[in-house]
Amino acid sequence: WCKQSGEMCNVLDQNCCDGYCIVFVCT
């Protein structure tokens, strides 16, 4: 789970959108 919005992430992170974190889950 991403800790802060805007950090890079992967699809395994629950709130990862297009390679970057968002504050809440993807819509």
UniProtKB/Swiss-Prot annotation:
Disulfide bonds join 2-17, 9-21, 16-26. The keyword Disulfide bond applies. GO terms for molecular function: sodium channel inhibitor activity; toxin activity. The keyword Phosphoprotein does not apply. Its main location: secreted. It is found in: Secreted. It comes from the Eukaryota. PROSITE patterns: DELTA_CONOTOXIN. Expressed by the venom duct. Keywords: Disulfide bond, Ion channel impairing toxin, Knottin, Neurotoxin, Secreted, Toxin, Voltage-gated sodium channel impairing toxin. One of its GO terms (cellular component) is extracellular region. The presence of a 'disulfide through disulfide knot' structurally defines this protein as a knottin. The cysteine framework is VI/VII (C-C-CC-C-C). Belongs to the conotoxin O1 superfamily. Delta-conotoxins bind to site 6 of voltage-gated sodium channels (Nav) and inhibit the inactivation process. Induces membrane depolarization and spontaneous repetitive firing of neurons. This is Delta-conotoxin TxVIB.
